[in-house]
């Protein structure tokens, strides 16, 4: 019954009240993060059960009333010491190799088909598409502000919706180049993106979105009084729709 009650709160396309676990994955990076998390939780569950069982057994059986005379082999045991040294080391190796593999895969930026500059300000994001220019030979760029609660339309998310979403094509290697006026952090959970933004320094994050959709994120570094207003909305569309959007931006 408990699992049935939680079913609707475990995997979500967007944040919901009282939601737990991860949002639905929409990129290979996020799928890898979720798989690593689930594997580690499996190891932790086994460790928790084993240690709890051993502690309860020791407390119940090795007390002064039941065993007034200490066992002569309990002061030192080479075998048990080898077991509790080698076993944790082996478990850490099982966790470390997939973790390092995922870390380097996320750090390696493929040759991107699209580059988007994202710059953090107090307290909004501005975006630029350096590969495309409009009729005045200016880069396509815009600012993205939070939509006030009073201006929300039906179906929009409170404290997440923005006035200008980032539009990128699905099934396309995209690189986000990130900078900031003060320290920010560009994070979008469904896509597995989280990159710190520092003044005077460029950081980079890559993403490959599996399908169309809208994915929300927020600044993950406390950056001032309106930190909670630095929302991120990335909309993935088909390549055809992306080209139509680009045409409108170039002409407009």
From Swiss-Prot:
It is found in: Mitochondrion inner membrane. It catalyses: 4 Fe(II)-[cytochrome c] + O2 + 8 H(+)(in) = 4 Fe(III)-[cytochrome c] + 2 H2O + 4 H(+)(out). One of its GO terms (molecular function) is copper ion binding. Keywords: Copper, Electron transport, Magnesium, Membrane, Metal-binding, Mitochondrion, Mitochondrion inner membrane, Respiratory chain, Translocase, Transmembrane, Transmembrane helix, Transport. GO terms for biological process: ATP synthesis coupled electron transport. It is an enzyme of class 7 (translocase). It comes from the Eukaryota. The keyword Magnesium applies. Its EC number is 7.1.1.9. Cu cation A1 binds at residues 184, 219, 223, 230. Residues 60-81 are mitochondrial matrix. Its main location: mitochondrion. The keyword Zinc does not apply. Binds a dinuclear copper A center per subunit. Component of the cytochrome c oxidase (complex IV, CIV), a multisubunit enzyme composed of a catalytic core of 3 subunits and several supernumerary subunits. The complex exists as a monomer or a dimer and forms supercomplexes (SCs) in the inner mitochondrial membrane with ubiquinol-cytochrome c oxidoreductase (cytochrome b-c1 complex, complex III, CIII). This is Cytochrome c oxidase subunit 2. It comes from Emericella nidulans (Aspergillus nidulans).
């Amino acid at each position: 019954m408990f699992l049935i009650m939680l079913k609707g709160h475990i995997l979500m396309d967007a944040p919901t009240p009282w939601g737990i676990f991860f949002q639905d994955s929409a990129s290979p990076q996020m799928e890898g993060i979720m798989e690593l998390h689930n594997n580690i939780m499996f190891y932790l569950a086994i460790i928790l059960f084993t240690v709890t069982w051993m502690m309860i057994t020791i407390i119940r059986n090795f007390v002064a009333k039941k065993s007034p005379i200490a066992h002569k082999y309990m002061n030192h045991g080479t075998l048990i010491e080898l077991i509790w040294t080698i076993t944790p080391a082996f478990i850490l190796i099982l966790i470390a190799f997939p973790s390092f593999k995922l870390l380097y895969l996320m750090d390696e930026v493929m040759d991107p088909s699209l580059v988007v500059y994202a710059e953090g300000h107090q307290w909004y994001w501005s975006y630029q598409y350096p590969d495309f220019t409009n009729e005045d030979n200016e880069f396509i760029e815009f600012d993205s502000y939070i939509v006030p609660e009073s201006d929300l339309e039906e179906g929009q998310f409170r404290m997440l919706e923005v006035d200008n979403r980032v539009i990128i094509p699905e099934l396309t290697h995209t690189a986000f180049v990130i900078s900031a006026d003060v320290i920010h952090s560009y994070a979008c959970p469904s896509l597995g993106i989280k990159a710190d933004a520092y003044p005077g320094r460029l950081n980079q994050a890559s993403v490959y979105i599996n399908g169309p959709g809208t994915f929300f994120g927020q600044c993950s570094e406390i950056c001032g009084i309106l930190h909670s207003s630095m929302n991120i909305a990335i909309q993935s569309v088909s390549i055809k729709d992306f080209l139509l959007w680009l045409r409108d931006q170039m002409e407009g």
